[in-house]
C-alpha cells in the first residue's frame, strides 16, 4: 500500500495579512470551493414578496417569521413595508395605504370572530412586514449579491434590489 498527500499544503506560508491576499487570489482564479468554508448570517426586515426572492437561494438556511402562528391582533397592528416604486401623495400610494388598512381591518375582524392566525392571514398582502434570517457560505453570498444587487441575470425586483444593495454596502 502507498499513501500520498493528495493536496498542496501551505500552512508554513501563512502570515499576518496573507488571508485577504489569498482570498482575493482564489476569487480572481474562480476557485470558489475554498469560500464555502466561511459562512455568516444576515437578518433581513422586508416584505413577504421580497422574502420569496430571498428564499429561492437553495444553498442557504433560513428562519422566517411565521404568519401561521403570529397573531398580529395581539400586538395591536399589522406592519407593512412601503413599496419603493410608489411616490408619496399619489393616487397609487393612497390606494396602497387604503388596501393595507382594509387588509388589517379584515384580519383583525377574522381573529375577533374566532379564526386562527393561519386562517386570517389569507387576507394579508405581500407588503406584510416579515423578518428572515439567512445563513450561507461566502460563495453563496457572492452568488446572491450578483443576482439580487448586480442583476447578473436580469433586472432585480425593485425592493429586493434595495435590500441587496444595502447589504452589499454594509459588507464593503
Model-based region annotation:
Residues 1-172:
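Family-specific signature for flavin-dependent thymidylate synthase
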Amino acid at each position: 500500500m502507498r499513501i500520498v498527500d493528495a493536496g498542496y499544503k501551505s500552512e508554513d506560508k501563512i502570515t499576518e495579512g496573507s488571508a485577504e491576499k489569498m482570498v482575493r487570489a482564489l476569487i480572481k482564479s474562480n476557485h470558489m470551493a475554498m469560500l464555502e468554508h466561511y459562512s455568516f448570517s444576515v437578518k433581513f426586515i422586508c416584505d413577504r414578496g421580497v422574502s420569496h426572492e430571498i428564499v429561492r437561494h437553495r444553498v442557504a438556511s433560513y428562519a422566517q417569521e411565521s404568519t401561521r402562528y403570529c397573531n398580529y391582533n395581539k400586538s395591536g397592528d399589522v406592519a407593512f413595508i412601503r413599496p419603493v416604486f410608489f411616490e408619496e401623495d399619489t393616487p397609487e400610494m393612497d390606494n396602497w395605504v387604503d388596501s393595507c388598512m382594509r387588509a388589517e381591518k379584515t384580519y383583525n375582524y377574522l381573529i375577533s370572530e374566532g379564526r386562527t392566525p393561519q386562517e386570517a392571514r389569507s387576507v394579508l398582502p405581500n407588503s406584510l412586514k416579515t423578518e428572515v434570517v439567512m445563513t450561507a457560505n461566502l460563495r453563496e453570498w457572492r452568488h446572491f449579491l450578483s443576482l439580487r444587487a448586480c442583476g447578473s441575470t436580469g433586472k432585480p425586483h425593485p425592493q429586493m434590489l434595495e435590500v441587496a444593495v444595502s447589504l452589499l454596502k454594509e459588507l464593503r
